[in-house]
């Protein structure tokens, strides 16, 4: 089991504006293991960006303890590192943002080289390093292009290369794909996954999109109004969300609400027979491999009319949603429900026949 590379314990962040006190982050504890791709999701104003800025102490917390890669960096209300040690620690933490923050008058390679200006490498070593970084992000052929000559995705690749210039152990992505189109977003996420695998890079993803969490992360924390309301593996959160906000994020990411709206307009649902019911089946892991609907027909003579089905792979484990009309004798449907529960399927009755 990997050890925690980032430990944020009981973090409070309070701002004072004139006569107002704003509690931006309230008693948040998050531990992120080495090699994680860890998502922090929430709407604007949830406190997620403010929280992650304490990792490299761009924002000092009001209270709490911060440990990064085994070193206590903040405790008892003050920074625990010398100025030199803090600078070195910050070199271990790269950041990328929604806005690429590239220098318009410098080429792609010059933008990456700028991050090495305080490095102890020789001029030749720096040049080789820049070439390697641009190759790593798939942009070596654009080394001499200026930002104005690059697409949004290419600019973000330059920003990623620059963030990796000092060989960080941690990469913080603050809404880094928000300004990109869906195709480019997928390409950037695929690149981040590749960097995670190749370099053992720990990635902290700040986003308001659960789809991104679903595509790339292995763990996720959900924030609301400065409070961490739910945290766990992506599989656990998607298959068994406990908080209303988490459920809202997930239904948006899976499209299940949109599917239900269309399903409810179908005649078979509008005029559901007395011996039928509309049900949502949620299942994960090994239960996706079993021919469960065939089994309940053979055992209980309960038919299943599939109106919607979707299976996705979350952290290498299949997770599925299905909306079906189950039809049969009342006692047989009850027995079929029980059998599905025993097989690890969550059954929600959406409507019963009249």
Curated annotation (Swiss-Prot):
Enzyme class: translocase
SUPFAM superfamilies referenced in this protein's UniProt entry, alphabetically: ACT-like (SSF55021), P-loop containing nucleoside triphosphate hydrolases (SSF52540)
PROSITE patterns documented for this protein: ABC_TRANSPORTER_1, ABC_TRANSPORTER_2, METN
Residue stretches making up the ABC transporter domain: 8-250
Record's keyword annotation contains Nucleotide-binding: yes
Sorted UniProt keywords: Amino-acid transport, ATP-binding, Cell membrane, Membrane, Nucleotide-binding, Translocase, Transport
Catalytic reaction list: L-methionine(out) + ATP + H2O = L-methionine(in) + ADP + phosphate + H(+); D-methionine(out) + ATP + H2O = D-methionine(in) + ADP + phosphate + H(+)
Molecular-function annotations in GO: ABC-type D-methionine transporter activity; ATP binding; ATP hydrolysis activity
EC number, UniProt record: 7.4.2.11
Binding site for ATP: 42-49
Disulfide bond annotation, renumbered to this chain: none
InterPro entries: AAA+_ATPase, ABC_transporter-like_ATP-bd, ABC_transporter-like_CS, ACT-like_dom_sf, MetN_ABC, MetN_ABC_transporter-like, NIL_domain, P-loop_NTPase
Compartment(s) where it occurs, according to its Swiss-Prot or TrEMBL record: Cell membrane
Cellular component per GO, a single term: plasma membrane
Membrane topology: Peripheral membrane protein
Pfam families linked: ABC_tran, NIL
CDD domains from the UniProt entry: ABC_MetN_methionine_transporter
Record's subunit section: The complex is composed of two ATP-binding proteins (MetN), two transmembrane proteins (MetI) and a solute-binding protein (MetQ).
Family: Belongs to the ABC transporter superfamily. Methionine importer (TC 3.A.1.24) family.
Protein task: Part of the ABC transporter complex MetNIQ involved in methionine import. Responsible for energy coupling to the transport system.
Protein name: Methionine import ATP-binding protein MetN
Organism, scientific name: Streptococcus pyogenes serotype M1
